[in-house]
A protein has these predicted regions:
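A short, hydrophobic C-terminal helix/tail in secreted or cell-surface proteins
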Residues: 157-162
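ATP-dependent carboxylate activation and anion-phosphoryl transfer catalytic cores
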Residues: 1-156
């Protein structure tokens, strides 16, 4: 903002981020509900100072892609879908057994989010959820996420620079 109170932006995303479940899990705030509330002309029922962060959350985007083949799209029909269940787990998905994944649209078929009191417990919860998540008939990024959640990742020893 300049001295005349004019706003300038280099970039602005006026949409809800794909990763919003991470924020929601760590704050208990329902961002979708609140966006609708504000869009309807109503005030938020809380102030910024009312929001407290608790724990850690991790989100894995599950795509109909083949991680063993440069993440090429994997269209087709989901023949089996067994979703993970339990505490501290959130699965946002419309996919089901019999669902056809098209080559013509975004191949994301689910967002899996796990919360824990600590980063380590969030990672443990995610590892369990990924083990329980079964999707057959197409290739998915589930095995890729399972490989990422290794000792190197959980102990922060992965290289982060090329």
């Amino acid at each position: 903002m300049d001295k005349h109170r004019n706003y300038y932006f280099l970039e602005m995303n006026t949409r809800l981020q794909v990763e919003h479940p991470v924020t929601e899990e760590c704050t208990g705030v329902d961002l979708v509900r609140d966006m609708i509330t504000v869009a309807a002309g109503n005030p938020l029922p809380y102030k910024q100072d009312d929001i407290e962060f608790s724990g850690a959350a991790i989100e894995c985007r599950i795509y109909a892609e083949d991680p063993e083949n440069n993440f090429i799209p994997s269209p087709g029909v989901i023949t089996v879908r067994e979703a993970p269940e339990g505490r501290n787990l959130r699965l946002d998905s419309a996919a089901y057994a019999g669902f056809e994944v098209s080559l013509h649209y975004d191949p994301m078929i689910a967002k899996l989010c796990c919360w824990g009191r600590t980063r380590a417990s969030a990672i443990s919860n995610m590892a369990r959820a990924l083990r329980e998540y079964k999707i057959l008939g197409i290739k998915t990024t589930i095995p890729f996420h399972q490989r990422v959640l290794t000792v190197s990742y959980t102990h922060l020893t992965l290289p982060t620079k090329a």
